């Protein structure tokens, strides 16, 4: 008897793992603060504006430093040692004979 393996259990497992990963990403994003009522007290407004400022600072965080372009990414991938090390020829290395 020939046993035919169906791919649906593996596909279901992969989809469930993907949903778990996406759920973790959604939970990591900060929640926008709720706006206070129209007749809110000044303390509530101050808390709202402080939490809104904190939210905007998190969402629009400045990125400092040089961004890597595609050429830099390729050079880091193929040459992980960097350009700090001088290139030596084989004649300068130890004799292997």
Swiss-Prot record:
InterPro entries: Pancreatic_hormone-like, Pancreatic_hormone-like_CS. The keyword Signal applies. Residues 1-28 form the signal peptide. This is Peptide YY. The peptide YY form is cleaved at Pro-30 by the prolyl endopeptidase FAP (seprase) activity (in vitro) to generate peptide YY(3-36). CDD domains: PAH. Pfam families: Hormone_3. Keywords: Amidation, Cleavage on pair of basic residues, Hormone, Phosphoprotein, Secreted, Signal. It is found in: Secreted. The gene is PYY. GO terms for cellular component: extracellular region; extracellular space. It comes from Homo sapiens (Human). The modification Tyrosine amide is found at residue 64. Residues 82-97 have a biased composition (Basic and acidic residues). The modification Phosphoserine is found at residue 41. GO terms for molecular function: G protein-coupled receptor binding; hormone activity; neuropeptide hormone activity; neuropeptide Y receptor binding. This gut peptide inhibits exocrine pancreatic secretion, has a vasoconstrictory action and inhibitis jejunal and colonic mobility. Residues 65-97 are annotated as: Disordered. GO terms for biological process: feeding behavior; intestinal epithelial cell differentiation; neuropeptide signaling pathway. Belongs to the NPY family. The record marks 30-31 as: Cleavage. Residues 68-97 form a propeptide.
């Amino acid at each position: 008897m020939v046993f035919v393996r169906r791919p649906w259990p593996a596909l279901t497992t992969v989809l469930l793992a993907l949903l778990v990963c996406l759920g973790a990403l959604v939970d990591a994003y900060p929640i926008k603060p709720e706006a206070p009522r129209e007749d809110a007290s000044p303390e509530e407004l101050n808390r709202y504006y402080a939490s809104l400022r904190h939210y905007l600072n998190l969402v629009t965080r400045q990125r400092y430093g040089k961004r890597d372009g595609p050429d830099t990414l390729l050079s880091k991938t193929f040459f992980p040692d960097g350009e700090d090390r001088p290139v030596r020829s084989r004649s300068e290395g130890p004799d292997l004979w």
